[in-house]
Amino acid sequence: MVLAHPERVEALIVQDAVAHNEGLGANWKTRRAFWADRVPNESALRTNLLSLATTRARHVGDDPNVERHDPDLWTDEFYFLNQPGQAEIQSDLFYDYRTNVDAYPKWQAWMREKQPPLLVIWGKYESSFDSGEPERYRKDVPKAEIHVVDGGHFALDTAADQIAALVQGFVGSSREGGVARRAG
């Protein structure tokens, strides 16, 4: 959206998302192979992406306190990911993700040029992306507000109240700098 309609963007809130190729890290080797040559690598991608272990890791990450996480979250996700037709849908969606990676330089250039108010929230137990990614945003937007919370990739699973307070504070302070809530 920032490239298609930059006038619609007043601020950015990012939660465990990547805008730099380096942020994908070593875990993305199988996924990169899939993007480079889909057909011979699709089975390996599906095995990786749709497995119970990978699904669980998206929620728990490297959190040593697994009991804080509701197992229904990853078991429900795993169940729905493994319904008839979902493997094909997920493969197609994931294959398309490569277009995001191709757009990273444009996203970075836009951030460097526009310097939008930027809140980056990162789960310290994130295992899908490289832990250095939050600081990479600061290279593009030096005034970025970065917070590492006690969570994994889906940090809202365990840090919803903290994240809500961070977002509320960001919107409130950014409002004075030009970010206004839209009437709904």
Set out the residue ranges of the language-model regions.
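Flexible "cap/lid" subdomain of the alpha/beta-hydrolase fold that forms the substrate-access gate
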Residues: V2-H147
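Catalytic active-site module of serine/aspartate enzymes centered on a nucleophile-bearing elbow/loop
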Residues: K143-G184
